[in-house]
A protein has these predicted regions:
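Long, contiguous binding/interaction regions
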Residues: 1-60, 68-80, 84-110
Length: 110
C-alpha cells in the first residue's frame, strides 16, 4: 500500500458557452459529495485522507490524498465516483470529461 496524492481534472467541452458553466460552488459541492463516502472511512475501496477541489472557469482540479495499492487504481476509483456524480446532473455537466493529472507517491511499503 502507498500514501499518494492523485490529481484529476474535470473539463467542460471547449466550445461550451462560458455563461452556461455551473457555478463554482455547485461544481465543488457536487464533486466533493462524490468523494465524501471514501473520506475518513478506512474500510472503503480507497481511503481518502483529504481532498481539495478547485473549480476554475468551466473546469475543476481534484486532488486527493489517499491510501491505495497504486496511483492507477486510486485514479480509477476516484474518477468513477466523479463520473457518476456528473452523470447524475447532466444539466450541469453535459459533455464534461475527466483527465488524469500527476500522481505523487509520498510513502510506499513495496
Amino acid at each position: 500500500m502507498a500514501v499518494l496524492t492523485v490529481e484529476i481534472f474535470a473539463h467542460a467541452p471547449e466550445d461550451t458557452d462560458p455563461d452556461t458553466f455551473p457555478p463554482d460552488a455547485f461544481i465543488e459541492t457536487t464533486l466533493r459529495d462524490a468523494i465524501a463516502p471514501l473520506t475518513g472511512t478506512p474500510e472503503s475501496a480507497l481511503p481518502v485522507l483529504t481532498c481539495a477541489i478547485t473549480p476554475y472557469g468551466g473546469a475543476a482540479m481534484v486532488e486527493a490524498l489517499c491510501v491505495g495499492p497504486s496511483g492507477e487504481e486510486a485514479t480509477d476509483v476516484i474518477a468513477a465516483r466523479l463520473e457518476a456524480a456528473m452523470q447524475d446532473t447532466p444539466d450541469a455537466f453535459e459533455g464534461w470529461h475527466l483527465h488524469a493529472g500527476c500522481t505523487h507517491v509520498h510513502m510506499s511499503d513495496n
